[in-house]
Amino acid sequence: MSYDLPKSALEWKNKIHSFVQNELVQWEIEAEMNSGEIPTEASIKHRKIAIDMGLPGMDAPKEKGGLGLSMLDQAVIWEELGKVTNALSWCFSEAQNWMYEACSEEQIKNYINPLLRGEKKECYAITESESGSNVDGGINTTAILDGDFYILNGEKWYVTGANKADFLFVQAKIGKGKNKDKHVLFFLDKDTKGLELLSSPLFSHTYSFHHHTYKLNNIKVPVKNLIGKEGDGLKYTYSWFRHERLMIAARCCGASERLIEEATTFAKERKSKDGTISDYQAIQFMLADSVTELWA
């Protein structure tokens, strides 16, 4: 089965396919054998190539220095990147469109534009022990205004990429006052006093981005680090969720295609009696089912 992509999407597909096949795939085994780590010079090279292509700004508006790509173009990019292990494809951060809509000029200067230029990395501290996707009802981290600062207290789980990040997006609820229980989102520098690393759980993957658990102990966050206004936090988090989950789905499709290709190649090469296991209908059925499910 095939379908025609618009010219721009096809150009991106070919460009990223070349990047994956010529630069990334060759490092897969080493990355898988070393918890996602590869030599620093190779990692720097991959990051530079991604930055030179403009990938950190694929969703950022053109007038802000980004590429302003369509969602289809972005999905095609992430589908191709999905054909290699995340240990290698996650070689750049993203400055997304919603950030330019939500953030002040000072925040854009200090946090978002450095993402766009590939100078900083971010992570998201949203999830808690009682909140996964139920961000609205399960957030217990509080933010209480005290003069020119908000005081944050709580605990955050599965903060993916925290070990390599420069700053965090932190979700909380107003702890008291007229806006009590309304959601807020903050920028938090990782070296802020009171940010305590509790643990870094091991997952069954092989990339170098860890999933820290943090405790927030009376952290003082400047009012200027509030994104938008009190009550805006949830809609901005949902903006990130929508974009991220679409691209995760695209990446999974790319991974599935790669897996089917690898399985097919193996079946054609694996000897069995006078032929290969690809001669067996049972194997053919499984591969055909996999292709059908992918295209469905």
Residue spans of the language-model regions?
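Glycine-rich beta->alpha junctions and the first turn(s) of the following alpha-helix
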Residues: 3-7, 11-12, 196-296
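A short core secondary-structure module
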Residues: 140, 149, 153-198
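Short Ser/Thr-interspersed hydrophobic loop/turn segments at strand-loop and sheet-helix junctions
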Residues: 54, 77-82, 172, 188-193, ...
